[in-house]
Amino acid sequence: NTPDYDQLQAEEKTVFPTDRPIREIALELSGDMRRYIWGINGRTISQEEKILIRRGDIVRFRLTNGTMMLHPMHLHGHYFRVVNQHGDYSPLKHTVNVSPMQTVTIEFLADEEKDWFFHCHLLYHMLTGMARAISYEGSEPDPDMVAIQKLHLRDMRDNQWFFWGRADVG
């Protein structure tokens, strides 16, 4: 069973300041059971650029799961609102389950800096590419994130059908 986020309600308001710009980003969780390669918007982390965001913006991800598997999506360094029927009292989370063929909307205040990791918490899905680097504009690249992308690209090049990988994620 997956949680019904419409049943969750925060005790206090979780809304962000209304004077901030809102950046909406559509992310389709993709992959299949034949090749067992997972991605976002049909691409793995090594094939895709970082998602650039601006400090101070409200970032809204619309996560659509186009697969037949559950994907618990986790964002490092930020709590996000799971936008639901409770509006101002939508719950705060750092991981959200996106059920098969469903869409969940999350939003967070971009109040950090540098690079942060957004990925499926099913580690094999993460290792095969269902992840993105979220990067604040003007930040220097995080060497650990660059290393993960290079490792994944090398593994995919060496064996296009299946691979064992490793990623250190803090």
What does each model-identified segment do?
Residues 1-170:
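Copper-binding active sites and cupredoxin-like electron-transfer domains
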